[in-house]
Amino acid sequence: SGRGTFSQRHSVLRNQKNNTRYVPLNNISNNQKQFEVVDSFLSELAVLGFEYGYSLVEPNTLTLWEAQFGDFANGAQVVIDQFVASGERKWRRASGLVMLLPHGYEGQGPEHSSARLERFLQLCSNDNMQVMNCTTPANYFHALRRQMHRDFRKPLIMMTPKSLLRNKYCVSNLEDFSKANTFHRILWDHAIDPQTKGFIKLKESSEIKKVILCSGKVYFDLLEAREKLKKDDVILFRIEQLYPFPAKTLVKELKPYAKNAKFFWCQEEPKNMGAWFSVRDYIQWTLDTIKAKNSKISYIGRSPDASPATGYAKRHNSQQQEIINKVFEYL
């Protein structure tokens, strides 16, 4: 929408003197396709239903629906349950609809923190849809590009933390967007990625004490904390695609740490929310497959709660700090 665009998009610019509109994406070249910006009315149920239907009749169009905050998507839960998650299984109708859901614990309270990631993961089976939480611009781009270049259609549920729009570590090189690159279901720690520089040097894989698996914004909180603490015996891995879960790829990544490290899943969400209950069995299978010495996956995150997040900034900050402390405390 033009009305609801945030500062990272500026899809519509308005001249306050004469009230004219300028759409930058319609002024790229003389022979380009038209980019249409529509101010939809504020009914998640109606609008998502329309977009789902549009994705069925126009499969070669990239149809994206973005919630103002992911928390508000539950206003369209009927469409999600009855159509997005199960339409292909029930009626063999394939949809490539993309749902962009701002999700991340940034201190904005219980109505502006959670897209209810756990609900989407609970609906996942039979490869019915994709659930992602991308942490680089390039991976986000390739996830959208893949939607159109595949010869089949699946709904894509994308968590989109707003704080990553201005995070100094959340960047990609220009070549990362090229055809030579692709979508990565798991991303390395910045400290072991040959394309990134300026981070502490980690110990050899045999000396790593903790392997932290996580997804989304919390990775950057942990990365920044580790840089300050100079902890060189803790390595972080990002699960960019939560479903279908990349278990076989994870086997390859975790195998070097099987002899000595302990393995943890870290999330910002309360224990009864987020990805924990969905990914736990997949990760446990991975550890069993690599015959890890410490073969149990453990949880680090908020305690179970009826509310997605606290409404008090001070409590939010203390909870975030507690998660970081647990990750980097000595075993």
Language-model features and meaning:
Residues 1-206, 220:
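Conserved thiamine diphosphate
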Residues 91-93, 104-122, 166-331:
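Thiamine diphosphate
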